[in-house]
Amino acid sequence: NGVFSYGTGTTVNISESMITTTADNSGGIQTTGGTTNATNLVVSTSGNSSAAIRSDRGGGTVNVDGGSYVSNGYNSPAVYSTADITVKNAFLTANNSEALVIEGKNSITLENCTVTGNMSDTKGSSSEENVHNVMIYQSMSGDADVGTSTFSMTGGTLTAKNGDMIYVTNTHCVLTLSGVTIQNKDADGALLRVVGNSASHGWGTAGSNGAQVEFTADNQTLSGDIVVDTISTLNMKLTGGSTFTGTINIVDNAQNGTAVSNNAVVTIESGCTWTLTGDCVITSLTNSGTINFNGYTITLADGTVLR
């Protein structure tokens, strides 16, 4: 690793520096306990499993302001979090991986960042389950405590070159987007996928390893499809004048797990708009805003069909 903070009570301060790593398993800045404060760094990693900003067992706190953080290997996000990581005013680029990963009871908070991921397939990836730009999960490996994962992004740009924008599995997640420009270059990629997984990597037990997501979009423009499987839950709220153009649908769990209730609960506050691009199936809807049906329908769990 280029810079390494280890152990509770350790503090590393670094600024105006260039860090380059070339080997596998070699991150740019790594925190395993303690605190790392980084300002205006230029970080580049070339190896596989070499996130530009990363943490490991032991958690810790990472504060980054300014700079450029680029990874080039497989399984090498720009940021991999098993800690509490805050990044402001930075460029975060993963050229052969998803852009961001949060594992377990940890967080990534971004403010005014330009984030780009390019996970073209699952080769060499930590996920054989899905191609995506942001992954939020619990591996059950012991690297991260079980608990709520938190992803918050305010301002900036979030770009996916392939796959789904956000993929959540086997964890509880609080997700907040506010004023982010979201660009998915893959027309077939979902905006958000909240599902179980095959457990081939040990991520929980197949059929009972869904995700639970609380998603707030505030002053946010959203576009794309949202998919929730029958062993997962999504509580989604549009607020602050947000607009969503797309669909929300509940699908069967691929591993035939026992279904849970309240799979997709949607709240649209006053001043917000949902424009449908296809038929939708959700659990319930609280609407104080506007829905443009465009000839499509919303089917609720009680059998009500809105049109």
Describe the predicted segments one by one:
Residues 1-7, 27-33, 50-57, 74-82, ...:
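Predominantly extracellular/luminal carbohydrate-interaction, adhesion, and secreted-enzyme modules
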Residues 6-8, 12, 22-23, 32, ...:
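A generic short-segment signal for beta-strand/edge and adjacent turn/coil regions
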Residues 8, 58, 105, 118, ...:
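Generic structural motif
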Residues 8-11, 33-37, 60, 82-85, ...:
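Short "repeat-start/strand-capping" segments in structured domains, especially the N-termini
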Residues 130-143, 147, 155, 163, ...:
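Clustered cysteine/histidine zinc-coordinating segments, centered on FYVE zinc fingers that bind PI3P
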Residues 184, 204-214, 219-307:
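Extracellular beta-solenoid/beta-roll
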